Amino acid sequence: VNQTLLRSAPYFPVHDVERSVEFYDRVLGFRCEYSAGTPLQFAICSRDGLAIMLRRVSPTAVIVPNEKQGGTWEAFFWVNDVLGLHSEFTAAGAVIVYGPLIQESYQMKEFAVRDCDGHVLGFGQALTVAS
C-alpha cells in the first residue's frame, strides 16, 4: 500500500472572495486557479504549487482569525529566500505583522503578513551556518 498525499490547503473564511482573490494576487503573488459562484463564493489561489482556499461567509462576525484566539498564523510556508520574499511582499504593500526575525528555539528566520480579512500567514526559512 503506497497512498501519497499530494496537496494540502488551508481554508479561510472571507467577507468578499473577489476582494480576497485580488489581494492574494496583487500582494502575495498567489494566482486564482479556480473560482465558483456569481458573485464569487469560493476560490482556490496558489503559488509555487501551494494553495489557499477562500470561502465567502456571512456575517463577518464568524471570521475569527487564529491571532484573535491567541494563536499566531492560519498557515505557515517554508521558503528558500525569506528575505527576498519579505522584500517582494513589502514592495507590494503587505501588512507585516512581525519580522523578519530569527527564532533561535526552532532555528528559523521568519516573518508574517496579515491579509485583508485578518488572517495571518507565516513565511520562514530554516537557519543554516550562512544565515
Predicted regions and their residues:
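Conserved active-site tyrosine of GNAT-family acetyltransferases
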Residues: S20-D25, F89, D115-G118
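Vicinal oxygen chelate
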Residues: V1-Y11, R31-N80, G84-R114, G124-S131
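Short acidic-aromatic low-complexity motifs
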Residues: V14-R19
